[in-house]
Amino acid sequence: MSSSVEYRIVTTWERKEDIETRSKTNRQDKNSLYVRTFEVEGNLWFVSSDITRHFNSLIPINECWNSISDHMMTIHTTTAGHFFEKVVDYYGLCALINFEEDPKRKELLEFVNNIHTNNLINVATPELVKVYMTDEEKKVFI
């Protein structure tokens, strides 16, 4: 990967049982979802591991928080001329995928796959967890 690109994980959350499942099988089952937010050279990216659509899809986001309810949020953003609508709940991110090539997409996928392969789980908390979870729900997450 290019050393000129800086990556910083902003937030991550997963269900404990998903981490245990993945460490045993080295795969994600269809119910195993997580979301990460990355800051790459000042731009925010969401990453999803919903294997029923595509493994570790990356979607850039720009001021795209449209609606927030107690446990759900819809995100709208446009990338490479494509419109995306994503629903986030406290189980993670389900994303529609843009399969078009992007110069940084390959680097980002390699970076995320490296994190996944080596089980380098950076768990953050802050705002996203605070928005989506009750105290009881937080107990099933790391």
For each feature predicted by the language model, list its residue ranges.
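Short, charged amphipathic alpha-helical segments flanked by flexible coils
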Residues: 69-79
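Major-groove recognition helix of helix-turn-helix-like DNA-binding domains
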Residues: 61-71
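Positively charged, aromatic-accented nucleic-acid-binding surfaces
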Residues: 1-58, 79-142
